[in-house]
């Protein structure tokens, strides 16, 4: 919890406004004595992750959706908002539902604000040491969309199940945010688990088929 002190205020009414949270928090406070304490409770930024399939097979493409809320950055000279995503060895990032592999160290994802008809394409950075890790920096996008503060948004992207998939394929995402570069908050990873079932192939000998 953070606390702030304001000194030498004249008596009267003050609008106290909390920023940096995913929900706008404010309170009209009357100052009518020398000392007064108020408490504002805001929800810290967070993300949730979902997959469009409950079970998958090798070769299938899974659509992942991350949902977040545009935080209020009023009064901040800078604000960091980065989404980190890590796949297991049984998944590979792909560009579409057809399973096209990325060709560059940039990976395109779709970002859409709730209630808006159009989405925008943003580029995530692929970790040079691990092609199954990406970082999506939405810091500038968050600042540019303060007219939508408090609204939810979604990030959509795809991953293909490969031959290294085990019984369960895990995919985790976490958020990195804050207005102080030296004191950035990292959320607990949100893990999506998708059971994987191998494709069973039975070979039939021609003579057995005719018998």
Go through the PLM ranges and name each one:
Residues 2-8:
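Short, surface-exposed beta-strand/beta-hairpin micro-motifs centered on an aromatic residue
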Residues 8-31, 66, 79, 140, ...:
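Serine/threonine-enriched low-complexity regions used as flexible
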Residues 22-23, 30-49:
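Extracellular beta-sheet/turn segments enriched in Thr/Pro/Gly and aliphatic residues
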Residues 49, 85, 199-206:
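A short, amphipathic beta-strand motif
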Residues 54-60, 193:
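Short, solvent-exposed loop/linker segments at the N-terminal edge
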Residues 81-135:
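A surface/secretory-pathway sequence property marking extracellular, secreted
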Residues 208-211:
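Short, ordered, surface-exposed loop/turn motifs in non-cytosolic proteins
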